[in-house]
């Protein structure tokens, strides 16, 4: 069965050093991967819990929140692509033991993220009405969906900055940091969902707007934790002691090479999801709410 062996089609390279045993490689892989697995599962689980907590308002609320998801993901597609690129580049720089280059890449990505997010946020808040209408809103979901979308996109900068920093930490092998920030962020989100959706313990009853505010508050806490992680001396991307906010031309070119293909993949995937969501939304509010519940349950199955 050597016909399908990769050694037949790949150019052989001399071994640079001793290859670790398979048992050691498996142990190291699990050690790095398990925090990311838990993080991914909890993010999907919290999305499911969010749906349950909003459902007390009725099927219109589930549908309204669901309508905002794909427009939001299209808005942050560039940052999802950037996080893929920065994770890959920081991992390379760690292998090269080039901390200065890794920190400069991270700093530049944070700067670009803040500027781009500000622009996208303003556009989405200003044009929330036509965006949500295009996404397939109905008379009973439109107002709640617009309100939710405006709050979420108004505070999306905390999500994008956290996303970029956590991606860099994953690339540096610090997957536990990303896990902790997401766990705390999601727990804060759930607590404020309970306080603000139904108006418990003296808090105002804000409905879907309360769910959006809870999400933003959770993102603020998570973002603060991510920023704090860059000031830890144990972190490979410890930002003190490194000057400059602009990476080298070589690093910028590498970011674009990795990020461009990731962005194209993200944008087309999200457009496909949006078109599918619009099709389902046209069936009616109750049908779309059922679809949203099903999608949240399905996300648990591939969160690992």
Identify the residue ranges that each predicted region occupies.
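Acidic, glycine-rich loop-and-beta core segments that form the ion-binding/anion-interacting portion
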Residues: 235-293
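Small-residue-rich hydrophobic transmembrane alpha-helices
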Residues: 62-122, 159-178, 291-304
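Hydrophobic residues within alpha-helical transmembrane segments
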Residues: 34, 38, 68-71, 111-115, ...
């Amino acid at each position: 069965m050597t016909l399908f062996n990769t050694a037949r089609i790949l150019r052989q390279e001399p071994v640079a050093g001793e290859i670790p045993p398979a048992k050691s490689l498996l142990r190291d892989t699990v050690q790095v991967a398990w925090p990311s697995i838990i993080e991914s599962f909890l993010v999907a689980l919290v999305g499911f819990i969010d749906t349950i907590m909003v459902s007390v308002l009725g099927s219109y609320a589930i549908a309204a929140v669901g309508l905002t998801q794909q427009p939001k993901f299209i808005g942050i597609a560039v940052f999802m692509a950037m996080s893929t690129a920065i994770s890959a580049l920081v991992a390379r720089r760690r292998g090269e033991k080039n901390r200065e280059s890794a920190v400069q890449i991270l700093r530049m990505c944070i700067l670009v993220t803040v500027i781009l997010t500000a622009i996208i946020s303003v556009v989405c808040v200003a044009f929330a009405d036509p965006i949500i209408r295009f996404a397939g809103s109905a008379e009973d979901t439109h107002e709640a969906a617009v309100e939710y979308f405006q709050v979420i996109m108004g505070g999306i900068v905390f999500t994008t900055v956290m996303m970029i920093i956590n991606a860099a930490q994953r690339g540096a092998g610090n997957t536990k940091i990303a896990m902790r920030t997401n766990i705390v962020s999601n727990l804060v989100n759930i607590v404020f969902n309970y306080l603000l959706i139904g108006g418990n313990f003296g808090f105002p009853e804000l409905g879907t707007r309360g769910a959006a505010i809870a999400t933003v508050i959770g993102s603020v806490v998570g973002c603060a934790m991510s920023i704090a992680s860059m000031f830890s001396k144990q972190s490979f991307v410890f930002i003190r002691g490194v000057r400059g906010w602009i990476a080298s031309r070589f690093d910028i070119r590498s970011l674009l090479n990795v990020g461009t293909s990731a962005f194209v993949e993200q944008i087309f995937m999200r457009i496909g999801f949006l078109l599918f969501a619009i099709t389902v939304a046209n069936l009616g509010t109750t049908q779309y709410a059922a679809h949203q519940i099903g999608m949240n349950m399905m996300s648990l199955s591939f969160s690992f």
